[in-house]
Regions:
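C-terminal hydrophobic helical "lid"/dimerization subdomain
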Residues: 1, 229-282
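Glycine-rich beta-strand-centered segment in the early N-terminal region that forms part
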Residues: 20-37, 42-79
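Short glycine-centered segments of the SAM/dcSAM-binding site in methyltransferase folds
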Residues: 71, 128, 152, 190-192, ...
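N-terminal Rossmann-like NAD(P) cofactor-binding module of classical short-chain dehydrogenase/reductase
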Residues: 73, 170-171, 193
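A structural motif shared across PLP-dependent enzymes of the aminotransferase-like
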Residues: 76-89
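Mid-domain Rossmann-like dinucleotide-binding core that forms the NAD(H)/NADP(H) cofactor-binding site
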Residues: 105-164
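N-terminal Rossmann-fold cofactor-binding loop
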Residues: 155-159, 173, 196, 222
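Glycine-rich phosphate-binding loop and adjacent beta-alpha segment
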Residues: 177-245, 279-282
Length: 282
């Protein structure tokens, strides 16, 4: 089968290359992939690793075994940008017929990251919450979940002077100057949850920035530490989508063969919402 393989030493991000068909382990499902999500972290890994096969967010149909023919969505260990992929069974859930594969493929990493961030933020009823990277795959969902939790939400690309003082929670993914500004905007006893650095710029933390804002916490978040929650999180998110309370914004949908164009668009910040590869149509 033809799968996406990274080529950081070449002129483009990746190439389609013939690879062996995957063989599922006893605790895995073999899935015929219909749609696969693209995450910004995968761009970083593709620049670092030769012959890397990205793709964790997949939605499709179980291709073998007792569950053959079942529509599922899940979080793979990689190798998802391909016609077939294996996924740990404990990180997959059935996909309701009324939710399409494209929508579902936006949830296993981006959606679950947003949900985990909101849960780590504590009780948000009446609290001031700022979400950075608010037009991205994680941000679009985090903004909606924070509002569902009763927060007063400020949605921005990065924290700057336009953000009001007294933010109880800041979900920070821009890094650099944005994180510097977050230190000046957070409330007494507030929380800054750092889950990315899309600017690739260093941040300066000056103790004096905390003057008048005692007990502020700056906490890191890495999605890999929460993968065991994927199935429960996916069930929650799918329920919200089915009820119409959560809208998944697809900013780019392209065939697998055009993966380099999709990666260029995401890298150049030309995608609002989630970028999705359509595998079945390739």
């Amino acid at each position: 089968m033809q799968a996406v393989v990274s080529t950081p030493s070449g002129e483009r991000w990746a190439e389609l290359r013939e690879v062996p068909d995957p063989e599922p382990a006893p605790d895995e499902l073999l899935v015929q992939v219909d749609a696969a999500g693209i995450n910004r972290g995968e761009l970083t890994l593709m620049q670092m690793r030769e012959d890397f096969r990205p793709g964790q967010e997949i939605a499709g149909v179980v291709a073998a075994g007792p569950r053959s023919g079942e529509r599922v969505v899940g979080l793979a260990d990689w190798h998802g940008w391909a016609p077939y992929a294996t996924v740990p069974e404990h990180r997959t859930v059935p996909l309701p017929d009324d939710i399409d594969f494209t929508t579902a493929a936006a949830l296993p990493m981006a959606g679950c990251t947003a949900l985990n961030l909101i849960r780590l933020s504590g009780d948000l009823l009446g609290r001031n919450v700022t979400v950075t990277g608010a037009s991205g795959g994680v941000g679009v969902i985090a903004v909606q979940l924070a509002r569902l939790a009763g927060a007063n939400v400020t949605a921005v690309s990065a924290v700057d002077d336009s953000v009001a003082d007294g933010q109880h929670v800041i979900l920070e993914s821009a890094g650099g100057a944005s994180l510097d500004h977050a230190l000046a905007k957070v409330a007494l006893g507030g929380l800054i949850l750092v889950f990315g650095n899309s600017s690739k710029e260093p941040s300066r933390i000056d103790f004096r920035e905390f003057a008048g804002r005692d007990r502020v916490r700056v906490q890191s978040f890495f999605s890999a530490h929460y993968e065991h929650l994927a199935a429960d999180n996916l069930r929650t998110l799918l329920g919200l989508v089915a009820d119409g309370r959560l809208k998944v914004q697809i900013g780019l949908e392209t065939p697998l063969a055009d993966v380099n164009d999709a990666l260029d668009a995401l890298s150049e910040r030309r995608v609002d919402g989630k970028a999705i590869l359509r595998v079945a149509s390739t």
